[in-house]
Structure formats: structure tokens, C-alpha cells
């Protein structure tokens, strides 16, 4: 009788971000001697055709590049009983190591043994969450990809709201890579996916959060691998309908509760319609498949904005948000010959939002929003897999992506200035600017994998490959009026009354700014940024006696960014042009608000990096049930294009600030008023100084990451995993004050020449919630060099993450499934709340105030000490399914902050610039917002005919128990001390002090019906 000696899975690093797996092992007789000439067949509904292998004298076999799915393995050899193993489940990027022992026989018979595949990816290095089709089918959640990411252990959403801006195990939200069917769809500027990922197209999602294999590019975050559905030998189609809306979705906050807070009501669905059609099947049985999808969604929500009259006496009414999305995909897989598999797919989408979703806020009226007028996305991919021999294959692919994103201003405010009240937090007038964004990307990769037996006494999986990628980001920006005007509690005079340096009269003193955005669409600000990457990698995964595997990998990357020539017309505000001529030009030598052109800048960021990556997997007891795992990686940062945006010679986001003395007292900014420039970086416009904007010796920062853990198969299909994750990074990139004349930074007191910074100590008075607090802030001296900033590594910026992850997975069998995790973690460092640039975004320049009450022990903005996620499904009689999904997350860390404006006479006497500064009054993490939790439920029923499901109906109840949370504004507002060392002065709290500025809590009931044919 044939005996299956061992079945256990080592999920090992995979080449080229491949979407496939490997099956390998050894065939022996009853005495353990290898068997040559054994014939293996590998079959699955997920695979085109049947693959085969003939063993050599070593008895070893291997099937590289196997499509994920459930497989049947058959082994035949004359004189031996035939062996069949069914239900071997393979996850993307995995290697299943399966050894067989065959028994001799004199008659033809079969020994059949059913075995389940692994319950959890057992990897030599990577820590990965696999969200398979069973989870995708039954999880109760909104039909969007961001909600799906919330199931991944260690995930923390930016602002605690499900989105694609997400951190995994302490990594920056901008450090993830989003990949669809081997095509990188990550926006090179903001580092989020360019398309909306359609959950109807998803077959599996693999999120690798630590221990990344060498084929994963230069990144420090998660590798989010979305595997789309493919066709099959049997035709299958579906028509799905999903709806929720008014009466089915409601706020859990009463009008009285909302009325007592700031207008921050949670958004509620007015209507949410989702229609999807899919069809897939054979072009020719075992030779070619196709899969197609068309999807239309229409969604409308209320917004938290309530009726309001702005300080210029304009009334603003409530408004709703609406979105429509049309998308389509077509995919073909062909196998024209036994050893060649080809793939082609195209994908397109079009999105329209009359109100751009990121602009929706309680403090922003309709006139201050933008219109997403038809965002288009296109993806095309070709790929081929060529099997050279039984143990060697070559995988090559190429992909192209293109996105356009037009964002015109709302017509109601397009010609107005932009207004912001620093006291109340209110916004009105024009939105940011009219913008036409574009993205293009091309990528190609090739990988060679070879399974080698008995090399130096052990078996090897040898991987070598390379990848090439180009990215382009374009922007065309203009705005009729470039004035940015600050109010304070309804008054245009931010600093009250002051003596004008021109007229010597007591007049209103305000803070205003002008951007350098052109005033006409005929001469917009045109910027183009390019990036090129070239990578190469090698890896050897050694198998020691089927008991341990060791992977040794090394990756090299070269990245180069370029700024194409930039041009712009003059701004549209006449006062800005006048101020530029009379105030800025005499000091700086030019008018930043006039027309300008700048030449191309090559090699803006040009760095090479080496990334060693190692992994270990050891079968503790030799049973294939318990594995000790560990990994070590040195992960370089991906430069992307975010840094180059911060280095643009002209930037749509750059605003030059001025003290505004309202000479005629009309409350309006005009040419007859007096203006004094803030000390800002006008040197950035000079080509001769441009190269000093970035450290010429800048190299890619690297994260030191190591993990250690244990996997245990508790029972068939049920696995447990414990993993400890350590990540640390020192010398994070920041933007610092820099003196180009002496080539020295001066962003800290200790590292600056004497007299550069003037200290000012004051005591911020007690408020309703907090005691009085003493703080020392720093103002630049009037004798300091002209403002200039440089991007460089900052020794004072660091981040550290320590986490313990416990996860469990019960695959869908015996009518139930379970997936969950508990993560205890601590995320600390100065690179977080202290330095947004360290998160890959444009940031304020670092000064000594950036480190007030900030230390390496401060909690970062992504710190969540405890997060719990559990999702399960039970199948009852009559094909009724009940699924529940629970999640809990600790509240975000925060700390009190205050904006301090020193007395004018003190500033004059001490030679200090009195521009306001904002600092923390305590270390971040001293306080936390409230934790959040929610429970979702789904009840569904399959209706079958002739043994096949024809209809599926379900109802979702999201936030079943009505959980809700709030964020209350208890910041200390603005402090105008009478002098140094005391606690007297004017303390102005924000207009929302003690009120909720964010409310979370809705309950939604949704219905869905799916017809299959």
C-alpha cells in the first residue's frame, strides 16, 4: 500500500513578485531509497492543462511556477502502487515541499489519500497575510479595497479611517507597493494605488508585511499583491447587484449630540449602488482561457458641512458628495505549446466626482472644493512563462499604466482668494488650485528559477533576475487669484493692531500669502518629473534534509530622478505682482510672482543601494507541523518622486507669507497697503544654489528589520502563527535650515553658530482640561543667514517599531472558517509627528522647535499598542452562511500643541524674528484619542439548481452594535505672552475647543443579489 510519508509546506521567497508557487519534493521506496522514473501528474481547475515530471536517480521532482489553487498530484511507477494526493492548497509565492514513499505491488491498484494544503503560509522569511477567495466571498464589509486591507494584521489606517493610506507594522504609509497581476500600480508621488482596486476582480490578496524576498523592490513597507481572477475550462458568469442608501444607513449620533459639537456629523450613504458583470471560460479547453468584468458604481453621501455664514458675509449651504465609477477588464491566458504559457490583459476605468472626496470636511464649503472631472486609468500587461526543462523556467513580463486626473476648482469660488481662519479652523473662498495631473509608468522584469539537486550536498532553489521601471508625473496648474488670507476668529487682522512701519499709524496687522501659481490656463505652471529604476537580484534557498531551509539573497538597485524644464506665467493677483516688485525684488533680485522658466535638472536624486535578505525555516520536530522561522533584511528606501516635488524650483504648494498692514482699514488686501516679507527661502529660485537644495552625498536610508517566530498546524486546515517584528531606522531624511555660503546646517541650537537662535521661555496658562505648562521655543535671529533649506539625512530623526503578532487561520472546510490576529506593538521615534517629510511627504523645514518635547521615546502618529481582528464564517443547513467580522484598535497618540507669538518689543530688543511658531507642550503619546471597535455581520443564502449555485443573496449589517467614537479638540490654541518668563498674556483657544471635530459612528444595512450562469 502506498504511504504518504510527509506533507508539509515551506512557503519560500518567490521570484519577480511572481503570482505563482512551486511544488517540489522527493520520491522513495519503502526503505527510503530514491526512485528514478516515477511519473508525476499535476492537475487543478486553476491550471491550464496537466503538467508532468519524471524523476531522476535522486528521486527528486519539482513543478515551478504553479498557479495558486487546490491541486491533485498523481504518482505512477511500474511495480509500485499509484499514489494520489488531493486538496494541496498553494498560496502565491509559496513552495510546497511534499515527500512520498511508494510501496511495491504485483497488481495494479491505487492508494488514494486525501490531504489538505497548508493552513498558513510557512515562509523562510516573509510574514504574509493571504486573503483567499473564501474570505473575499464571505467577509461582511463595504465593497472597497481599503476595507479589505483592514483585515491584515498590523494594519493602521491614517486618521483611523479605512483608506489605501495605511501603515503595516510601523512602516510609513508612503512606503507600500501596490501590485495588480505583477504590474506596479503605485502612484510615484503620493504612494497610493492609482486605480480603485475592484474587489470583484480579486482572486487572492497577499500582503507581505515583513521579511520581503529579494525580488520585492527597494521599499520599506508592505508588498500588496493583488491577484486577479482568471478563466477556467468551464464557462462561468455572474451578474451582481449591491445596494444600500437612505433609510438603510444612518448616523448613530443624535441631532442634540451633533448640535452640541462642531459640525462634524459622520458621513451617511444616501445611495450606494454597485452593479458588476463577469464572464470567464475556455477559448479552447486546456489551451486558452479568458476572463472579463464590467462594473458600474454610483454612490452619494451626506457631508459633515452644515449651514454657515463666512466672515465676508457669504452664506454657505450644506452639500452632498457623489461618485460614479465605470471600469472594465479583459484577460486572456493561452498555452500554445507544452512549455510556454502566455498572458495578456487590459484594464480601464473612469471616475467622476463633482466634489473631490479628499476635499470633503466639516470646515470646507462647496465653493472651496474641487471637481474630479473624469479620472481615467489604463493598464496593459503581457507576460510569458517558458519552461526550459523540468527544473528551470524563465518568467518575463511587461506592463504599462497611464492615469489622468483633472481637478478644476469649483466655479463658485474659482475666482476668489483662499481664506483660512486660524482660530476657528474654517476654510472658504477658492480651493487650492486648478490642476491637471498625469501619471505614466512602464515596467519589465525577467526571472530565471532553477531547482538544483545535490549541489554541495543539499538541494537548492536558485533565483536570478532583474527589473526595469520608469515613471513620469506631470502637473499643469493655474489659479485666477493666488492670494491666501489668514483670519483669526473672524477678523482679517491675525495679529490685531500694530504701528505701520510706513505710515506710523495704528492699523490692522494680518498675515497673508501669495503663491506663485499662474493666473491663466493659457500659461500654466507645467512640471514633469521622471524616475528610472534598475534592479538585479540573486537568491539561493537551500534545503537541508527536508528539515530546514535557508534563503540567502542580495538585491541591488539604482534609482535616478529628473526634473524636466519648468515654465509658468505671471500670477493673476495685481497686488501680488506689485508686492513682488516693490518688496521681494529689491532684496532677492527677482519677482517670484512674475513669469519664469527653469531648465532641466538631471540626477536630482541618484543613489545605489544593496539590500541583503536572509530567511530561516526549521521543522522543530520533523513532523511538518511546527516550524521555527526567522528573517533579517536591510531595506533601502524607494526615492519615488515625492522628494523631487519638494525640490521644484517653483511649486504650486509654495506660499510666500507677508505681514500685511491695512493702511486704509478696509479689511482688503490691495496695492496701497504695506507689506513686510517673512524670512523665507527665496534662494531656492536661483539656479546657482539649486544643487545645494539636496545633499550631494545623500544615500538611501535603510531599515534594519529582523523577525523570529513559530508556526504550528493545530489540526488540518488550522494553523497558528506567532511572530516578533523589530524595525529600526536612524538618520531619516528631513528638510533642514541650511547656510549655502558656509555649507553648514543650522536646524538645532547645539549644531548652529552662536546667536542664530534666540530662546524664549514662557508659561502657557492652564485651560479647562490642562494645567499651566512652561515651554522654551526658539526664534531665528535677525542676523541669521537668509532662509534656505536642504534635504539631507538628519541624525536626530529616527523611528523604531517593536511588535508581537499572533495570528490564526482556519481554511474553509467542514463548514467553517476563521481568520484573525492580535498585535501588541510600540512605535516610537522623532520621525513621525516631528517630521512629515520623513513620511515621504513635503514638510515644514526642521528647526529647533521641531524637537521641543520630542525624543526617541515619543510615540509616532502610527502607534497603536493593541489591535484585534477576527473574521469567521459558519455554514448551516440549506446552504445558509453566517459571517462576522470584529475589529478593535487603540486610539492614536497625540499631544497638546500651541502656537506662540512673542511680544514685538521683545523681538526688537533681542534681535529675533517674531513670526509665530508651533510646538508640542508634551511628548507625543502622552495622550490618546479614544479606541475604536466595530462588529459587522453577514447572512447569506445560496440557491442551487442541479447541484450548482444559481443565486446568492445576502444582507450585511455594518457596525451591528452601534459603536461610535469622537475626537475632541483640546489643543491649546494660540498664546500671546506679555514677555519672557511669565504666564501673563492673551491665551486664545480655538473656536472648536472642547468640541468634537470628528465623529465616527454609522450603522449600515446593505443587500446584495448575485445571479450565476
Describe each PLM feature range.
Residues 315-319, 459-621, 833-838, 845:
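Signature of Gram-negative outer-membrane beta-barrel scaffolds
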Residues 717, 730-731, 735, 826, ...:
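C-terminal beta-signal and adjacent terminal beta-strands/loops
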Residues 80-106, 110-230, 258-268, 272-281, ...:
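Periplasmic N-terminal accessory/gating domains of Gram-negative outer-membrane beta-barrel systems
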Residues 267-353, 372-395, 555, 612:
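Transmembrane beta-barrel wall of Gram-negative outer-membrane proteins
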Residues 721-894:
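Gram-negative outer-membrane beta-barrel transporters
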Residues 10-124, 198:
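Periplasm-facing N-terminal accessory domains of Gram-negative outer-membrane beta-barrel systems
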Residues 158, 565-611, 615-793, 847, ...:
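Solvent-exposed loop/turn elements at secondary-structure boundaries
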